[in-house]
Structure formats: C-alpha cells, structure tokens
C-alpha cells in the first residue's frame, strides 16, 4: 500500500509497520536456508558491514544470521524512538536478505545494476571526497515521474560533481530519457529493489571503519562519525511505502539525514521536505555543504563529471598531437598577461574528420605572487581542466600530450576558442594568485615545431632543478591535514623525498598549495633539528604532528615502517607490511586483489593502520615514494623488500636495484610465508645472508657472555655464589664444576 504522509503519528506508525513487515519476511526467508551456508560480500574486509559496524558482530553463516535476526524485536508503542529503532532493524534485515543473494550467486546483480560496492572503490573515492572534488554522496531512491524534472535533477547533481547512488525506478526513467550513467559519471545504479539500498548504506558505514579507524561495534562513535564527517544524504522521491519509510528511519538513526519531495513532519537536519526543483541544493544544506557552480558560455557541459570520459576511434572527430603527430603543453609565468584567447592555425571545423593534427597549448599567467617555480604545478592542471570539457579526452603531459574530441561535442558546436576560454576561466577560478591569463592554442605545424623546441629546453631546466632537491637541501617541509575530515588524527608529511601517501601531492605541489592558500589544509613545517637522518626524525615535524594529531602521536620517522612510522588515513596507494618470518617487508598496492604471503588481501592489511593510527610494522605510502632514494632507508631500503605484486613490481621496476629484481617474490612465485622463505634462500636474497650473519653474531655474543661470566665466577666460593643468588630469589642454577643446586623455596 502506498500513501502520502502528513502527520507525525502516521509516519511513526508506518515506520513501525514497515519494520515489522521486513523482520517477518527476513525470518521466513532464513528459515528455508541451509544453516551452514556461508554468507559474505566480495571485496570487503568488513563483512557484513551494517551488522559488523553497528553491532560488532561477525557473520559467517546463515546460522549466525538466524540467531541475530531471531533476537531482534520491534516495539508496538508508536514513539519516535521506537520508530528509529525499527529503522535500524530494517537495515539489518535488508543486509541479511542481500547477503543471501551473494551466498547463492557469485554475481546476483546484472547490468546496469552494481549491487555491493567493494572496499577498493570506496578507498579510491577517498581522495576526491576529502579534497571536496566530490562534495557529497546522495542516495536517490524512488521515481521522479516527469522527464524534464528528471533531467534537471540529474543536471543539478552532475554540475556539482556529486556521487549519486541510484535505487529503484529512477534508473529506468534515466534509460527512457537517454541519460548516461556509470561510476565514471558518478551516477551509479545500485539496484531496483528497496533492499538494494543497503549497498549505499553499507558503503557509508565502512567510511568510519576504513578512514576513521573506529572499531566495529562502537555504535555511538560510528554514528557520530557518519553524522559529522560523511557528507551523505538520502533523497527519497515519489510516493513512499512503509518499508521505504522504515529504511529511511534506519538511515536517520545511523546519522544519515533524509530529504523527500513528500510532505513530512520536519526534524531539522534529519528529516526534511523540499520541492524537487531545489531538492539537491536543500539536501546539501542539511550537511552544511556549499558548492560553487561555475557557468561556462560554451555549447557543451564543463565539470569534473566529464573526467574519465574516453573517446574511442569510431567516436572521434579529430585527434590533436598524440603518438602519431606532435605537440606539447606549457605554462609560463609572464609579467603581464591580457586575459586573451588566441588561435594560431586551423580550428577544428577546418580539419578533416578523423585526422591527426599537430597541437600546442601555451598558458601565460601573471600575478604579483606568482613565481617561476610554480609553472610545473600549474601546468599539470591543464590535463584536469581539458578533461572537464564534455567530449574532450586529454592524456599525458608536456610533449607527450594526446587529445581527442568526439563527434557529438563537435556537432554541438565545440571549437578551440571554447576550449581556450574554459582553460582561462578555470585557471583564474582555481588559483586566486593568477590575476590574468592568456591561452594560446597553436595548430599550425611549423609554429608548433618551433615552439616545441623552446618548450623542451624549459622542461629540461625544470627537471634538473627538481632532481637536485633533497630533504637536506631545504629548511621547510609541508604538512597536509586534508584527510582529517575522515581521519582526525592523521597528519601527512610531504618532503622532497616523500610525496603524500595518496600519491597526488609532491613537494612542489605542496609548496604551491601553501602559497596559493596560506590558511588551507596544506601548510609549512619548519623541519627543525635532525634527530636521526637515517630514520628521518626532525624536531619540527614532531612538534607539528604532536599538535595536529591532538596529542595522539609524539614522534614520527619519515623513512621507517618499524620505528614510529608515519600515520595513515585510508587513501594510501600502497601499504608496507612487516613479515617477521623473514625479517623483511612486503608492499601491496590498492588495486591488488589477490592475497599476500600472510594469506590476507590488501583491504585487511590496510585496516591495520588506516584511520590516522601509527602502527609499527605497517605504513601507508604512495607508489612514487617507492622510487625515492630514501625509500624505507631507516629499515634497510630495498634490501629489506622481499615481496611485491607482479603489477606493482613492474611499475616500479626502474627503482629496484638491478641485482635485486629477480630476488623479490610476487604472488606468482609464492603463496605462503614458508614458500617465501624457500624462494628467498634459492634466489640468494640479501635478507637471507643478513639474517644468517645476525644469528651467527648473536651466537658469538652469547658465547662471549658465557665465557665472561665463567671468568668472573672463577675464584668465588660456591657458598658465596649461592648466598648472592639467594638474595635475588627464585630458582638458583649453578653450573660451576658441573655442580647443580636448585632451590625452590627461596624467600625474597
């Protein structure tokens, strides 16, 4: 039965009825199942997330589920508290029903629906969420019922670059309206049935576990985290049945507010009503999220929602630069730019369809606080800004640049002038220190060649300058607390030899960011006195970390995984983990889906140190740090690395000492620590020799100690020795002249 709701009492009653319906249905479903059937979701270390997160209970079989579900009850009295509790029961039951689907089928969801969203994807969303690039997550449930209103709703979501998790009839409506969706567009169809909404809820519930480091079962802490740190809102559209209302109540209880285009009793910040035309903006207000929407006077859309778009050969109108032509991109700081866009050569409509053409884009920027050292940092943003443009695909950088423009955008009227205007506007929008900006686009072949040679000289000078910078050459490091919105005690330290662990910020990036926004999340750290050069311990770093971590971290070693390692949030590209059986290290990257020699996947290992924790033996890192000359130097560097996934090993091949490359195992070489030990011995890894030498050294030291003790004891009468030991208490063993005396009754 579907109804519209106007009174608080009626809503409470509907929620309780909906919760009871779901609870009874779940009991009936479970009663028919084999108790020994294993239940879990693929790709997560937090099974089953809602139950594990809120209750701290690990569910492994149908029997476990039955025991839990049969212990649940919903009170009849129509109070708000009982309704919210009924909502939580509804979420738990939905989790049980959905988990059963995965127990019976490897892939219960067929396209276009995705169902359960793995940890890997959530971790991948971490950086854009903390940066604010993805400002919010909207769980959109139900049906719009009007094609034009649907288009406006989706447009409002897209131009704000919001991640939308779609449940119910809205997906079919989007199909009928020819609106594209997918993770690359941040419009994710989760499922058609209301129980599939649990996959949006269990995505949210994993945020405090993964990024916040909160222990499962600490319900109040998890709810507080969701309420104050996760920018998620449920948008319930169209007529709502009792079960949908109950699920919504569960979300409210868990700290995720609900907004609907129905008339409902308002609970400010928890349950609100809005007309559909303004529902996106009002949803953001419930979480205090402000998004500035920049308008562009061009014939196609512009924004982060277009990033990741691919232009395949059959869809391509023209290709600019790329492997079969030539070109470059360059940013130059000049004395006085004029805010102009200039095209030298043919525009797109003068090029032959399907052709490949030389291309250059030169961005000249001026401003009182700009300096030459910022050119490279600004230049890397060209890639991002061009990919903001609908129908434009930009790959690579510098003189390897490769651009394609698709037929649809060309037919809508997109031209080079528009591309130049977007780049100019975005540079000024994103970088307030850029006061004026010229964009010069060149397609004339001879002119591109001429300017290309000049650009190569500039690249060369930059690289020489950058390569020469080391930690010992600078007085200032940089800190980043961007991730504290998710991991409150995490402080990332960025040096010339250690990029941010998310991999997105190097030393020059951090320097530019601190200069552009002195009050922002990236800031200077005077490095102070070096206490240990090998480990990378500095007084200035310790002072800042102590203050910014709320006193939870006293000291931090920049280049060690064993001695006071750096804290980790949840966005790291890879994790270093200690393998005690071989006294060495393994490194697993985020995209590795297999198991390490421990028998554990990346997600499990990552859970050991994420959330801003400092855990000796585990540390999150960026992949680019593996190419640093100071990589784990406090622990022995590459000579202590014994295991890498094959894909990662290939990616960092140039950084691995040549004589070590074949001696480092991959998942194809070993599956267990026993196999790893055997592999390292066969290959003659330095760690084997080091371990053997240490054992010999320890034995020799023990021999010397025994000898010294015997020499010390010579001349001492046995009686004296016994008296002396007796004062110390305990069992006395005297091995002088092979005489053994044992006293079990010595009093202190």
From Swiss-Prot:
The reactions it catalyses are:
Co(I)-[corrinoid Fe-S protein] + acetyl-CoA + H(+) = methyl-Co(III)-[corrinoid Fe-S protein] + CO + CoA
Cofactor: binding comment: Binds 1 [Ni-Fe-S] cluster.
GO BP field: acetyl-CoA metabolic process
- Provide the disulphide bond pattern: none
- According to its UniProt record, the EC number is 2.3.1.169
GO MF term set: acetyltransferase activity; anaerobic carbon-monoxide dehydrogenase activity; CO-methylating acetyl-CoA synthase activity; iron ion binding; iron-sulfur cluster binding; nickel cation binding
InterPro entries attached to this UniProt entry: ACS_CODH_B_C, CO_DH/Ac-CoA_synth_bsu, CO_DH/Ac-CoA_synth_bsu_3_sf, CO_DH/Ac-CoA_synth_bsu_arc, CODH_A_N, Prismane-like_a/b-sand, Prismane-like_sf
Q: Binding of [Ni-Fe-S] cluster: at which residues?
A: 480, 483, 569, 571
Q: Which CDD domains match?
A: ACS_2
Q: Which residues cross the membrane?
A: none
Subunit structure, interactors included:
Monomer. The ACDS complex is made up of alpha, epsilon, beta, gamma and delta chains with a probable stoichiometry of (alpha(2)epsilon(2))(4)-beta(8)-(gamma(1)delta(1))(8) (Potential).
Name recorded for this polypeptide? Acetyl-CoA decarbonylase/synthase complex subunit beta 1
Q: What's the source species for this entry?
A: Methanocaldococcus jannaschii (strain ATCC 43067 / DSM 2661 / JAL-1 / JCM 10045 / NBRC 100440)
**What's the gene?**
cdhC1
